[in-house]
Amino acid sequence: MKVVNILEIADVNEALLNAGVPARVRLRDACGGQALWVEVSRGAVAEKDDAAVLAAAREVVGSYFAGRAKPVAFDDDGKSFRLA
């Protein structure tokens, strides 16, 4: 089973920052598995702009993990994701 490590979270968050996307990837890791999601920075954008920010974040996150042979699949909410 592929897993995401904390260094990858730091790297993907840096990639989001460098791309100008006001969002961060969050990781909750437990013995039952990992939960990953994108969190939009509330101070940076209005709630009505969440969809555009999430779309940009999905692009950056998808590209980052695909480059590491760890493609991701986003859930219907557009925020939560897992390794595919």
Region annotations inferred by a language model:
Residues 1-30:
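N-terminal acidic leader/helix
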Residues 12-19, 55-66:
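Short, solvent-exposed secondary-structure boundary motifs
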Residues 27-48, 76-80:
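Short glycine-rich, basic-tinged beta-strand/loop micro-motifs
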Residues 41-61:
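Acidic, low-complexity, intrinsically disordered interaction modules
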Residues 59-84:
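Charged low-complexity stretches with an acidic bias
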